[in-house]
Amino acid sequence: MKALLHKILYRTLPLEGYLRAVSRLFFISYRLGLGRRSAATEYVYHLPRLAKAGDTAIDIGANLGYYARPLSEIVGTAGRVHAVEPVPVVRRVLRRNLRGCRNVEIFDCALGAENKEITMSNDSARETGYLGTGRNFVGDAAGEGAVTFTARMRRGSELFAGLERLDFVK
């Protein structure tokens, strides 16, 4: 049923609208406590055991904010969340999903071994019929029907050189 809904949304909405709808459904499910036994979403429910108030966290590949938003609530006003998301359309939805999370900073890059422009691709629609969020990869070998994005890659050691502490990395 979930896959059918994803296919319908992906085929009828523009990409950003699809991502907004999918993320809205996730956050509703999360608030209701659904998905605890789903392989795709179970880990977000473990965050309160891994992070605490006042922590500094980095969310690498923040995607639509499925971890950054709960982390923002957990670390509270004394903590900080650094969300790294290189894909522009995904980052726009991430910003929307993190409205009001004053302790989150969003970085518009991927993390890697060097500072350079990269191509990221997602060819999950070929296999599933819809774009699987969180399935973007770096490389020029995108298959037929792949969605591609240009992004910046930055060295994490440089990007986060000024952090005084780091308590949690996803």
Regions found by a protein language model. Give the residues of each.
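Phosphate/nucleotide-binding beta-alpha loop and adjacent structural elements of enzyme active sites
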Residues: 1-170
